[in-house]
């Protein structure tokens, strides 16, 4: 178990090193500065021998006169090296964390929709924020301690053995015990760190859930429920933190106690006549001071074990994430602009983990420039069909063709440029209205194009009344706009894209009747040269569709034009009567 853990840590560090070595120049400068810092400390201890053996023994000693300048010089060098090492390692660490965050963020954007269906958004955010920051502990604080304290230990050991190898041999007996203690503590830190990462994700998810649903919380008086829920996860985080602190607090005195045994033995041996005769006051003081000085770096290395293991545990979690298979993009077919003919051939689809298929043997065609509407009760599978068009999910059987080519054979990015999507769940970015509209068009637009799209979507009616017009910031997810205004901005975004296939998933559901009429006139104009799939709740918006499909329980139960389906007096006619209060 321990061997596997050590191997895992080593593999993780090697992967992390691929990021660190990008900044090896800064790292090299920092390491040199740390070594100079440690050597300065060791040399300061070595000055005790000539000071005691020669300096105080001779009134004419030049050593005493030069000592103040020597000490000042050492402290100056130590100060400069400390600043350089701290700055350079912070620079390296900051860049490494930035690269790791970019890696995770970029991989998120390549993951399939099904991955986000399963993961809590709070946990995903925690990996970019908390876990990435923990990597900094392994690339800055930990490295500082490992290099500086490691060099100090080596320097002090050399100094001790040089002055009295007999007394220094005691450390050989103590060293294995110290090494075992540090190894034991490392494994404990690693386990606790992993638990802390998981708990931090839960804390973030709980807070995010409340913040996003604060209106629901206030409306239904759920403050106590949310408070109780957050208290539980916060306490779990506190418990994990206390476990880490307890392990760290216990490790320091244990290692110091082990080291103190060596000091006690040295004091005893120094009193033995055969050894005492070989010692001068300076020699004994140097050896004893060096041995006592080992306590600080040993304690620091114990503390850094906690930091290093937290960083390794976080890095392991992040690397496990980026090792997940991204969204499949095996298609190679590409076209600048599709004609827009869509054929759905006997498709079936089941969501991961679901027992019942969302769609079962669905077939229909949308000729170029025609409009097909999907209607049916909630959960019947209408939006699932739209998601399959753009390959947010892949069909289990059957195929969807665009211009006679299976959508799975298209290069994924190229396929999605052929579609413009407006759903009932509008997402706007914390940016200006203009940039939100232009988001769909990349850099292929002008200011006039944005204004024209906003005009067609009847968005300029409210935009023109704003002080900054199109340059108005909309807030997080369009918080400063009403539901209808957000919907019109989203429609303007789709209009600007000018894709050959338009998907309207309850696109007018958030609009009042007057706004809906205005939007519908713009959409009627837009649909003249485009293939359109409309998913609608309001049947009044799809009466002009070339074909209407009634979806129920994942299957097509009726199809035809509005008049044909009314005349048939089946499921569609029943929906129509319910919605319009007829009969």
UniProtKB/Swiss-Prot annotation:
Enzyme class: translocase
Highest taxon of source: Bacteria
GO terms assigned for molecular function: ABC-type oligopeptide transporter activity; ATP binding; ATP hydrolysis activity; ATPase-coupled lipid transmembrane transporter activity
Keyword entries, A-Z: ATP-binding, Cell inner membrane, Cell membrane, Lipid transport, Membrane, Nucleotide-binding, Translocase, Transmembrane, Transmembrane helix, Transport
EC number: 7.5.2.6
Catalysed reactions listed for this entry: ATP + H2O + lipid A-core oligosaccharideSide 1 = ADP + phosphate + lipid A-core oligosaccharideSide 2
Domain remark from Swiss-Prot or TrEMBL: In MsbA the ATP-binding domain (NBD) and the transmembrane domain (TMD) are fused.
Identification of the protein by name: ATP-dependent lipid A-core flippase
Source organism: Vibrio vulnificus (strain CMCP6)
